[in-house]
């Protein structure tokens, strides 16, 4: 019913030692669906490799996100946004079209700096992070200007987080096997910030931590 399609749990040479850190498994609540019918995909993420929360290190710079998509029998790809859980600060754990990091204007002597894109990932993807806030309550990547912290939605050691994705099957979905792919990605530095600061490309390399494939059958 499902399979790990990328699993680096035994790869000791993987870059940044993050590949395989988190185990993934995904499954649908039903296996056969018709167009217009909703299917709920659950994804479990288990931190089996670290004795600390993931991501760790300079967590104000790091971003880890879960991307889920469905591909029908004709190859049409559909993006599945995560279901909200309703906890305080959740908005900052879901990919959005939003600006942040306005305090980068301080060292640049740009008092009206509007900021850059906060996430640089598909809108609706689940993010595992702990945001840092400047004295004005805006997200910051500058530790020296940090006044407070937001919700810590990182994955703790031996912790399992479960995310759900409710997906109404499109009316025009092609009948046959629909593949559901869950991918957990990691970046040391968010793409918009890396581009603004003109850092080397490898600093913003997207590393696939793990990936899991399952499927449903779309009936005619």
Task: Please give the residue ranges for each predicted region.
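Short, surface-exposed loop/turn segments at beta-strand-coil junctions that are enriched for proline
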Residues: 168-174
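Solvent-exposed, conformationally flexible loop/turn segments
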Residues: 35-38, 158-160
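Single conserved hydrophobic/aromatic residue that forms the stacking wall/gate
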Residues: 1-8, 12
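Internal, hydrophobic beta-strand segments that form the core of beta-sheet-rich folds
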Residues: 64, 177-189
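Extended, solvent-exposed segments with strong compositional bias
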Residues: 91-163
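Short amphipathic, basic-aromatic surface patches that mediate peripheral association
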Residues: 45-58
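Short acidic/polar inter-strand loop motif in beta-rich domains
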Residues: 50, 185-195
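Short beta-strand elements
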Residues: 193-220
């Amino acid at each position: 019913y499902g399979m790990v399609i990328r699993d680096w749990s035994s790869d000791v040479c993987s870059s940044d030692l993050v590949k395989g850190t988190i185990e993934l498994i995904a499954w649908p609540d039903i296996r056969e669906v018709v167009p217009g019918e909703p299917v709920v995909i659950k994804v479990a993420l288990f931190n089996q490799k670290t004795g600390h929360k993931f991501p760790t290190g300079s967590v104000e710079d790091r971003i880890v996100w879960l991307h889920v998509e469905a591909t029908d029998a004709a190859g049409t790809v559909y993006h599945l946004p995560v279901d909200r859980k309703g906890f305080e600060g959740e908005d900052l754990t879901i990919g959005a079209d939003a600006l942040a990091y306005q305090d980068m204007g301080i060292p640049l002597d740009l008092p009206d700096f509007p900021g850059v894109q906060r996430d640089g990932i598909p809108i609706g993807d689940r993010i595992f992070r702990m945001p840092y806030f400047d004295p004005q309550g805006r997200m910051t990547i500058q530790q020296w200007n940090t006044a407070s912290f937001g919700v810590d939605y990182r994955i703790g050691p031996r912790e399992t987080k479960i995310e759900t994705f409710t997906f109404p099957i499109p009316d025009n979905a092609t009948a046959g096997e629909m593949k559901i792919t869950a991918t957990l990605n990691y970046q040391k530095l968010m793409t918009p910030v890396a581009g603004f600061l003109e850092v080397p490309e490898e600093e913003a390399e997207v590393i696939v931590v793990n990936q899991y494939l399952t499927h449903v059958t779309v009936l005619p």
